[in-house]
Amino acid sequence: MARSFKRPDEAAMQRVFARTSGGAAEVVLRLAWLQGLHRAEITALRWDQVDFAGRALLLPDRTIPLDPSAEACLRAWYVRCAGNPECVAVSDRDQTPMRPESVSRLARQALNSEGLALSLLDLRRDFILRQIEAHGWSYAAQVSGVAAAALREEFLPRLRAANTLPEAPKVGRDEREYLLWRIIQQEGSSPAGLALWM
């Protein structure tokens, strides 16, 4: 049986973004829904991991292309948070780093204001589903940091039930491609990493 996921209504999310425009809640929600970050990744995100020139988030285990609206939001937030040049998730009031519980509470309040009974995890799952539907299993594995096999186990029944399966999953190829990508990410510019790139 397919596990049911709570998926946000896009129009409702746009209303939430408009209501929270320019604040910490908008940043948190965009990082979860448009970039697929976990709560722990949101609270740990530093400005040196936000590559505006390369339009990407550079996390320790993966690189995530920046959604244009998330990029615009982060650029405005960067200017506003000049008082805290390190941490991205800071409070509106005093620009101090937010605790994980505060991030969840802020997101829940913003989502509830539009009648959306969702969590940050629901937003991340929706991000992953959208990546699978739009780009396939391998790409979704790369940007989510979840192995393709684990993605298939969790999301394949849901996609089949919704009749939105993008392609038949290629178990061997996708998994090998993802594992090679992870090794290259971990090795970086080491001799082994450079050899793999060649």
Model-derived segments and their meaning:
Residues 1-14, 60-69, 82-86:
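DNA breakage-rejoining catalytic core of tyrosine-based enzymes
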Residues 5-39, 124:
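Basic, Lys/Arg- and aromatic-enriched nucleic-acid-binding interface segment
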Residues 28-29, 40-45, 140:
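Alpha-helix N-cap/helix-start motif at helix boundaries, enriched for small hydrophobics
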Residues 35, 44-74:
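Conserved tyrosine-mediated DNA breakage-rejoining catalytic core shared by Y-recombinases
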Residues 67-116:
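Active-site/catalytic core of tyrosine-dependent DNA strand-transfer enzymes
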Residues 104-142, 161, 168-169:
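Short, basic (Lys/Arg/His-rich) helix/loop patches that form interaction surfaces
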Residues 137, 144-177, 181-185:
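Catalytic-site neighborhood detector that most strongly recognizes the C-terminal catalytic loop/helix
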Residues 183-198:
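Intrinsically disordered, low-complexity regulatory regions
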